[in-house]
């Protein structure tokens, strides 16, 4: 079975919507990391301090085909291409340890259901 990491870097206000969207598409557990970012365009400053707003980094470890489905669902539900409030992408994973065997069985069942 091949795995992928789906990474979504989003404005904090989209975090819950993104998690719900991923779950609807078959995504399971997620690791949430608080983050700050610096965009390509300069933002307004206040007394020399720039406030970009906080962001959330959502990290999902998914079966490869499922990661594409979840990514498309996130893009559809959050309108990432048009809102400039986030970015999502997948990365292939070569070696993975620590995934619950029950989760692997769920991935396998989802693949069989899709065939």
Regions found by a protein language model. Give the residues of each.
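Positively charged, small/polar-rich N-terminal and surface patches that mediate targeting and assembly
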Residues: 1-115
